[in-house]
Amino acid sequence: MKLVLMGLPGAGKGTQAEQIVEKYNIPHISTGDMFRAAMKNNTELGKKAKSFMDNGDLVPDEVTNGIVRERLAEDDAKNGFLLDGFPRTVEQAEELENILNDLGTELDAVINIEVDKDVLMKRLTGRWICRTCGKTYHEIYNPPKVPGKCDLDGGELYQRDDDKKETVEKRLNVNMKQTKPLLDFYSEKGKLHNINGEQDIKDVFVDVEKILASF
């Protein structure tokens, strides 16, 4: 079973990825993990990726694609995998097709976890952290007993810059713009399966299982 998992930040992709790889016994292959492994193993592509990352530059497609090619050729990916964080562009999606074609296989499905932007905003901007002990709260899902104060030590709660509304909205807008052409690409190929990510976590996974039952 060869899968790509998609979803905007806050959609619950990580939770579903854990459940998919556990149930179907396939490796969870994320871009970050691939880069780290290639650099740790000191491969030629790993060295190239490191040089770009050390300079704060984006790793170019030719290096990323090469690392993906090496990873998907490994034994544990022969019977299936869950790709997470790749592809990010139509060009990368086309290269993924070439890689899988060279390996004598193809993608089975692309699962996209859909969540309305307003819901994502609530999920992502609700996090508050205690300045004293670092305990994390969420104003909707795990609120403190007294607003603005930590349950454990009464410390002041603050919000990280990454969790502030303006930052989150900008991040979501960038992601939505990047993702749309990719969703259209896979939709045209009949590979795309959209799932309602606003349901309970268990119900989201039930929908995932229904899709994967046909493979």
Swiss-Prot record:
Belongs to the adenylate kinase family. It comes from Listeria monocytogenes serotype 4b (strain CLIP80459). Its main location: cytoplasm. One of its GO terms (biological process) is AMP salvage. GO terms for molecular function: adenylate kinase activity; ATP binding; zinc ion binding. It holds the Pfam family ADK_lid. It catalyses: AMP + ATP = 2 ADP. Residues 126-163 are annotated as: LID. Its EC number is 2.7.4.3. This is Adenylate kinase. It is an enzyme of class 2 (transferase). Catalyzes the reversible transfer of the terminal phosphate group between ATP and AMP. Plays an important role in cellular energy homeostasis and in adenine nucleotide metabolism. Keywords: ATP-binding, Cytoplasm, Kinase, Metal-binding, Nucleotide biosynthesis, Nucleotide-binding, Transferase, Zinc. InterPro entries: Adenyl_kin_sub (IPR006259), Adenylat/UMP-CMP_kin (IPR000850), Adenylat_kinase_CS (IPR033690), Adenylate_kinase_lid-dom (IPR007862), P-loop_NTPase (IPR027417). HAMAP family: Adenylate_kinase_Adk. Coiled coil: none annotated. Monomer. SUPFAM superfamilies: P-loop containing nucleoside triphosphate hydrolases. It is found in: Cytoplasm. One of its GO terms (cellular component) is cytoplasm. Pathway: Purine metabolism; AMP biosynthesis via salvage pathway; AMP from ADP: step 1/1.
